[in-house]
């Protein structure tokens, strides 16, 4: 008989390698065939609900790493909540309207002008659905569980109808109005943009300091005086209607050199500006308060017939410029507001495509607005009023889709009033819990400082604004007309608005004082796509009876504070008076390994499919767990390779646990806590503490904490300690001995707990593990999270063992020194003499454990500290260690060096302990002998 046949060497078919790219797909197919997600939902019927409402990604293109981080994070939460006793359905969604889809069709060669609006919209719809299918496949490949066959799409008729009803409720409350205001205007898209559709880039623009001659000084200034203004948009000078100053500033009237003209500047800026203009011998003629200059009139530098009025505003600064601001009400919000106050025209001499209109005169007409800068500067110079031209670096808004600069431009638009409900919205924010908590202030400040929301778009692929016009041009949007449109859209889809005449979209027999002849027209603009996604609380959460409104959680990137978090909050407070969410969790962006934004032009993109094909989705999932998603996250193949190593450690740990519990039946062989060995009690308490820490981290969305605690537990508590000690017990002790069964009870409990706790993170792997466990549920996903158990005197036990672990570290240090001195090779070759204080001796007695076994040495003798020799390695005044090579021979069964080899004459090669085990459990060894 061979010695190895008397050992309980662990065996398992659980493979060492995951082969994830292949096996993950097999598992996902199995889950789909067996409807595991649906089974989980049914299992949790009647339990408290937890609804994470999915922010819809835009249906265009393949998913990127930011998508993966977002969807996987959501999956962690939904899966963990499902296993923690909540009914946690997950309904994925897509944002399916908007300009990028129109642009994709244009790129594909579709001639929009050759099609009717309805035909073009149908092509947009088909394209969007194709993109949804592509992204759905990508998201499912990440292992994300949810209602993939029943997602919400903003193009679905039932969703569009609810969106129209949200609009209707806001109209009913007087929150929808039409106005001509400066809005972000994208000439490249030929449409207004919302704040959330704008991104800022640093640019260099031509700026000009120039004088505007006073023609009516109101008794304060004479006519040989010039107001000095500064602009960074010389192309807007043709639209100038006035000059804005601050009532409280001191303004100096100055002369310089031999120039007879006088110039007005903010007194605080005279020295800086004089140096900039190259003026010498500057004299201050007089100083006046800004308030004294109100209504002073100046000559427009280009148009002699136009006069510019001096106005008092509160947005003027002396940080730069002259303290006098060129004011064009058609091209800026501050300009517009003060222009309204002073009754100025809102003059907008730039068309939808960014070209100067005919009424600007022959020098400007037909020029692209940026080209008009040069003409303005030239005309100022010709007029002799250009004081300084210089480049100016500043942050400027761009269309986030076309990546082209935009302009502020006053156009007739439909607005949703934020101002009327601002206080209510701000109050609602205070009821929301934020992760991280700085998110509350960020959203609060954005709502506090934002203007009204321009909700109209001059495009065709979107939800129509359900507004009619009477014969007198008055807008008609009654509760009756809007609900009628909503029902038509619900039945036929929003294309019906573009297929039917206005009269066929109104309720039968509808009349209005605005149309005595019964003739009506309809609005041609569509709603901002942020109104689409921002209505999802009604289109999805309130509409599906198994969801809740408000939702428990919205989880998106930090850009959504000005996007979806923002628009959803406005529409929800307007609709029902409260926020659409109880909690907001925001995440950073995914950057490349050097901290740069990923882009095709830089060639620094890493896409999820690339990682999945090489390593598997589990590696991306574990990577998401490992990073601080609340901040920007760097992505590199190197980081995935590091995570693959952590995955390998996890897998190997589990493999050991499975291999050493194959002959363990928890129903028959489990040992009660009170009857366990001391070391097993300690590990049982530790794994329960670990369980609580992980469950708490799930509850607080602290993913990175889960990763840290997982890695620490499997490397420190298991691999470096318990599993190391376990080999000397589970391999060597009698198969059914209480000592071995005690340790197997713990090993099995640990692997079950690890499997359940990691199922939200690594479902493909844990389901593979589950097939080797003896649990009742068919799938790990259908199990519950492990219970946190508490035991009598557990803290006392942990403190005792923690003190021993400190002593163990000291012994290991002494063993390492002995190894360096070539006294020993492996630790089991050592004989350790331990010299301990009375306190340590009391601890060792209280441990009631095999200390030699816990130290993994062949021999151990314990002595009073007072007997420690000079050469002992001392640790404080608590203990000292001497290491020598153990005497005796190596037992071929336990691999320890023993002095009692051959004490059993029938088993002459074994130590006494092994001989006793073999004699009692393997009688054939006595007759056959051992080799």
Curated annotation (Swiss-Prot):
InterPro entries: aa-tRNA-synth_I_CS (IPR001412), aa-tRNA-synth_Ia (IPR002300), Anticodon_Ile_BEm (IPR033708), Ile-tRNA-ligase (IPR002301), Ile-tRNA-ligase_type1 (IPR023585), Ile-tRNA_ligase (IPR050081), M/V/L/I-tRNA-synth_anticd-bd (IPR013155), Rossmann-like_a/b/a_fold (IPR014729). Keywords: Aminoacyl-tRNA synthetase, ATP-binding, Cytoplasm, Ligase, Metal-binding, Nucleotide-binding, Protein biosynthesis, Zinc. ATP binds at residue 600. GO terms for molecular function: aminoacyl-tRNA deacylase activity; ATP binding; isoleucine-tRNA ligase activity; tRNA binding; zinc ion binding. Its cofactor is Zn(2+). CDD domains: Anticodon_Ia_Ile_BEm, IleRS_core. This is Isoleucine--tRNA ligase. It comes from Ligilactobacillus salivarius (strain UCC118).
């Amino acid at each position: 008989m061979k010695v190895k046949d008397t050992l309980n060497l662990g065996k398992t078919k659980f493979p060492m390698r995951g082969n994830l790219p292949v096996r993950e797909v097999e598992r996902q197919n199995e889950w789909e065939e067996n409807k595991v997600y649906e089974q989980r939902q049914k299992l949790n019927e009647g339990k408290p609900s937890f609804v994470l409402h999915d922010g819809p990604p835009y249906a265009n293109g393949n998913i990127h790493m930011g998508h993966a981080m977002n969807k996987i994070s959501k999956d962690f939460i939904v899966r963990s909540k499902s296993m923690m006793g909540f009914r946690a359905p997950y309904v994925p969604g897509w944002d399916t309207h908007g300009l990028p889809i129109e642009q994709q069709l244009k790129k594909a060669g579709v001639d929009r002008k050759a099609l009717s609006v309805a035909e073009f919209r149908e092509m947009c719809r088909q394209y969007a659905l194709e993109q949804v299918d592509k992204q759905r496949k990508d998201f499912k490949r990440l292992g994300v569980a949810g209602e993939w066959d029943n997602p919400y799409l903003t193009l679905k008729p039932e969703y569009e109808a609810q969106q129209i009803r949200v609009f209707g409720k806001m109209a009913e409350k007087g929150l929808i109005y039409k106005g001509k205001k400066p809005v972000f205007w994208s000439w490249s898209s030929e449409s207004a943009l919302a704040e959330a559709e704008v991104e800022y880039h640093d640019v260099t623009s031509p700026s000009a300091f120039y004088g505007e001659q006073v023609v009516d000084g109101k008794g304060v200034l004479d006519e040989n005086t010039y107001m000095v203004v500064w602009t960074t948009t010389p192309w807007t000078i043709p639209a100038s209607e006035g000059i804005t100053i601050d009532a409280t500033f001191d303004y100096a009237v100055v002369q310089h050199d031999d120039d007879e003209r006088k110039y007005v500047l903010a007194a605080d800026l005279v020295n800086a500006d004089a140096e900039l203009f190259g003026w010498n011998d500057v004299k201050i003629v007089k100083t006046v308060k800004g308030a004294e200059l109100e209504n002073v009139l100046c000559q427009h530098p280009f148009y002699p017939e136009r006069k510019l009025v001096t106005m008092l505003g509160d947005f003027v600064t002396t940080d730069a410029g002259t303290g006098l601001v060129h004011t064009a009400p058609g091209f800026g919000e501050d300009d517009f507001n003060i222009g309204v106050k002073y009754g100025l025209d809102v003059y907008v001499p730039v068309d939808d495509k960014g070209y100067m209109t005919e009424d600007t005169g022959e020098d400007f007409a037909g020029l692209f607005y940026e080209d008009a800068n040069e003409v303005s500067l030239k005309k100022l110079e010709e007029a002799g009023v250009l004081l300084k031209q210089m480049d100016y670096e500043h942050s400027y808004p761009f269309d986030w889709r076309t990546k082209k600069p935009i302009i502020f431009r006053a156009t007739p638009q439909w607005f949703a009033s934020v101002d009327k409900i601002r206080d209510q919205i701000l109050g609602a924010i205070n009821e929301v819990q934020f992760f991280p908590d700085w998110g509350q202030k960020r959203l609060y400040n954005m709502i506090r400082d934002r203007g009204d929301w321009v909700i109209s778009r001059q495009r065709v692929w979107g939800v129509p604004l359900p507004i009619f016009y009477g014969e007198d041009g008055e807008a008609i949007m009654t509760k009756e007309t809007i609900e009628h449109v909503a029902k038509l859209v619900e039945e036929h889809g929003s294309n019906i608005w573009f297929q039917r005449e206005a009269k066929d979209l109104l309720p039968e027999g509808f009349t209005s004082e605005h149309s005595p002849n019964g003739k009506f027209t309809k609005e041609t603009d569509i709603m901002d796509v942020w109104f689409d996604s921002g209505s999802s609380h009604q289109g999805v959460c309130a509409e599906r009876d198994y969801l809740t409104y408000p939702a428990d959680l919205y989880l998106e990137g930090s850009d959504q504070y000005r996007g979806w978090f923002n628009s959803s909050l406005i529409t929800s407070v307007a609709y029902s008076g409260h926020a659409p969410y109880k909690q907001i969790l925001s995440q950073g962006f995914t950057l490349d390994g050097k901290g740069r934004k990923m882009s095709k032009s830089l060639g620094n993109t890493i896409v999820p499919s690339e990682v999945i094909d090489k390593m598997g989705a589990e590696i991306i999932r574990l990577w998401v767990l490992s990073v601080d998603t609340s901040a920007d996250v760097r992505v590199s193949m190197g980081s995935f390779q590091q995570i693959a190593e952590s995955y390998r450690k996890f897998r190997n740990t589990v493999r050991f646990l499975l291999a050493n519990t194959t002959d363990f039946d928890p129903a028959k062989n489990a040992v009660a806590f009170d009857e366990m060995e001391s070391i097993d009690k300690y590990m049982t308490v530790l794994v329960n503490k670990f369980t609580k820490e992980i469950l708490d981290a799930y509850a607080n969305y602290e993913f990175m904490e889960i990763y840290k605690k997982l890695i620490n537990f499997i490397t420190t508590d298991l691999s470096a300690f318990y599993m190391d000690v376990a080999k000397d017990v589970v391999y060597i002790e009698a198969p059914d001995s209480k000592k071995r069964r005690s340790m197997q009870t713990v090993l099995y409990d640990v692997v079950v707990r690890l499997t359940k706790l990691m199922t939200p993170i690594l479902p493909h792997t844990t389901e593979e593990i589950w097939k080797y466990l003896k649990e009742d549920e068919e799938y790990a996903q259908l199990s519950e999270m492990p219970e946190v158990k508490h035991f009598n005197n557990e803290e006392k036990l942990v403190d005792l063992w923690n003190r021993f672990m400190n002593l163990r570290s000291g012994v290991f240090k002494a063993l390492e020194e002995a190894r360096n001195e070539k006294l020993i090779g492996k630790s089991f070759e050592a004989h350790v003499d331990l010299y301990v204080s009375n306190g340590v001796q009391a601890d060792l007695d209280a441990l009631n454990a095999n200390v030699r076994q816990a130290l993994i040495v062949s021999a151990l003798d314990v002595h009073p500290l007072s007997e420690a020799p000079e050469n002992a390695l001392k640790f404080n005044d608590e203990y000292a260690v001497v290491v020598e090579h153990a005497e005796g021979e190596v037992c071929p069964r336990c691999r320890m060096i023993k002095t009692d080899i051959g004490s059993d004459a029938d088993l002459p090669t074994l130590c006494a302990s092994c001989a006793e085990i073999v004699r009692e459990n393997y009688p054939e060894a006595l007759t056959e002998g051992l080799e």
